[in-house]
Amino acid sequence: MDKGRCTILNSEELWAQARQLFAGGVNSPVRAAVKPFPFYVERGKGAYIYTVEGNKFIDYVLGYGPLILGHSPESVKRKIIEQLEKGWLFGTPSKLEIELAKKISSHIPSAQKIRFVNSGTEATMAAIRLARGYSKRSKILKFSGNYHGAHDYTLVEAGSAATEYNVTTSDGIPMEIMKTVEICEFNDLDCVDKKLRNEDIAAALLEPIMGNAGVILPEKGFLSGLRELTKSYNSLLIFDEVITGFRIDIGGAQSYYQIYPDITTLGKIIGGGFPIGAVAGKAEIIDNFTPAGRVFNAGTFNANPISMIAGIATIEELEKEYPYNIANKASKTLVEELERLLKIKHTINHIGSMFQVFFGIDKVRNYSDAKRANKEYYIKFHERLLKERVFIPPSQYETIFTSAAHEDDVVNDTIDKLAKVIGELS
């Protein structure tokens, strides 16, 4: 193929090629939810992404969460370039992994020790194996609509793109594995009590704030009750903070709610936009990973220098606090304006720099509620915003994110476009 020709193809032409090369035309299913075909992005800067055609979009997807500083922040880019000059993979430890681990441990209260991996999926997979190895129990309790990555142990009643494409329980997972996963609804402590009572649950695994069924918040007493129940029945508590870690608070949702798990999984923001995952927790638990213990985990790219330096540089910016002030203000303003503009039945779940709007329903407290929202209206809302060059997630079951690059001028421009779209839909 003529590489020069490829650079001038438009999105429709690229989509035609992609469908010949990839299952469904994409390499992660939610990307195909943009209709009639995905637009292809060439670059990003600040709050904006730019397509191969040169169209400029205000971006509220932000790579599905990692880009809390916006696209290509200079402070992070500079350090990545410096590291690229030195090398990007050595097959040995580097001092960068120590620096990033210290950063994480200084902010995440429960992170006494850490194992770096390459994605949120790898992190939850390793965390489940670790919990089983440590507890000598085989079952896991998860919550409907929580999404913990694309592996067998959690693709049961899963949210995110699994819900979008109606494969909440994936084909290809042996029944024997499914039988090791118990399910409760989010915010349902009675169910948790019943499931844990048999004392065969290694760990309860959840997103402390659901970010993969829209945004769904824990009700008062839910996380504290869950912590008490897991302790009472000698089960571990795993917080999947791949989305919420370093976004809700520099210490994650656990710091925000003051509820501390035994194990935390991290990803997204701690890699500054590069592939990363981490399993963090109490030293006595994490020390069960090889080579200290007998729970095997390994990876060629674990703690690769580029992800490490990008994470360090990102957290250094977050320590200055201004990113949270800007991102949270942007989110709050957008939610307030949406509430003012929307005249139809709806609810907006919002915390920090993440929110989602649900149409046709006045309360969403769990996955069952989220599925009752008017998905078709949300799709129209998304499509009309695309025409105005505003990019929100194409799926109802994802999160709208803001960043430190969403300054007042960006937000005000967005509000004008929201007013136009909502007026057209009314």
From Swiss-Prot:
GO terms for molecular function: glutamate-1-semialdehyde 2,1-aminomutase activity; pyridoxal phosphate binding; transaminase activity. Its main location: cytoplasm. Its EC number is 5.4.3.8. Pathway: Porphyrin-containing compound metabolism; protoporphyrin-IX biosynthesis; 5-aminolevulinate from L-glutamyl-tRNA(Glu): step 2/2. The keyword Transmembrane helix does not apply. One of its GO terms (biological process) is protoporphyrinogen IX biosynthetic process. The modification N6-(pyridoxal phosphate)lysine is found at K268. GO terms for cellular component: cytoplasm. Keywords: Cytoplasm, Isomerase, Porphyrin biosynthesis, Pyridoxal phosphate. Its cofactor is pyridoxal 5'-phosphate. It catalyses: (S)-4-amino-5-oxopentanoate = 5-aminolevulinate. SUPFAM superfamilies: PLP-dependent transferases (SSF53383). It is found in: Cytoplasm. PANTHER family: GLUTAMATE-1-SEMIALDEHYDE 2,1-AMINOMUTASE, GLUTAMATE-1-SEMIALDEHYDE 2,1-AMINOMUTASE 1, CHLOROPLASTIC-RELATED. Belongs to the class-III pyridoxal-phosphate-dependent aminotransferase family. HemL subfamily. This is Glutamate-1-semialdehyde 2,1-aminomutase. It comes from Saccharolobus islandicus (strain L.S.2.15 / Lassen #1) (Sulfolobus islandicus). The gene is hemL.
